[in-house]
Amino acid sequence: MTDRGTTCPSPDSDSPSETPESRPTKSRAWLIAVCWILGVGAVAATRFRSQWDAYRSIHQWAANNGIPSSLRNYDSLLIYILAAVIGAAIVSKVLGGRTTETLRLSGSQSGIARMLALATAPMILGGIAVGLVRGGLNFDLSAAWPTFSSGVIRAPIGEELIFRGLLVACVARMIGWHGRVFWINAVFASLAFGSIHVPWNHDALGSWPAFLVTSAGGVWYVWLLARWRSLWVSIGLHAGMNLGWMLMGASGGAGGGGWIENILRVATIAVATKATLRMSKRVES
């Protein structure tokens, strides 16, 4: 909870670790390259890992020993976590600070829980209501777990660590949190985020709505990260919106859903945006 006079970090304020010594210089451009190589490498590894004989053998062994696919597929989250942590550790080693600070997983979290509760209410509560009306709300944990595990745990944590934590927050240690260069990098990170939500084949052209909506959502998540300077905001919203989508039984990914689903999604975006503008506004003395 946040007192009326409490605000989250202003977008114009620097964190304690952003000292003059750690501001961007041309000689540190290689750190940006390291972050992007790790990020792209992690995405490629998760996308193509099923083509590796050794990987298939391990998964077959796990399946034969009764390990369900919903648990076996946590290897994708592990890949994302390793890439993000390694990248943040390298940046922190060179520029100073802690790895968790560089990834924006630590520091002031004032007001975040309150904002997330308000913002995700339309999607989650609306999702429960819509699911009950449609008769598709599944209270069988064993049946709902695979979808919940993938959409509410693996995807929000892994994708936010890579596309906002590694490719935006870590890179911001070199280029700053403002200006054209920051937003150019943010757009490229968001396009990469959108690309993992469409097929990487000839069917991709038919998935352009999902690509555009997801990429735009990625830019919005970056804006939230820049305002709050906390990755937990985008992780929480990402998880909450996916949970609402799951409860409603919506189909079509980010570019799909009917008018009810999209009204609730817009409501969540509107509440989060308004709350962010109000709660992150600098208090004038």
Describe the function of each predicted region.
Residues 1-104, 128, 243-285:
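N-terminal, membrane-interfacial amphipathic/helix-forming hydrophobic leader that caps
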Residues 7, 109-111, 234:
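A generic structural micro-environment signature
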Residues 12-14, 125, 202-205:
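A generic alpha-helix propensity feature with a strong bias for hydrophobic helices
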Residues 28-36, 72-81, 111-119, 143-148, ...:
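Residue-level signature of transmembrane alpha-helical entry/exit and packing/kink sites
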Residues 46-50, 130-135, 209-210:
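Solvent-exposed, well-ordered amphipathic alpha-helical segments
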Residues 146-285:
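Transmembrane helix-loop-helix hairpins at the membrane interface
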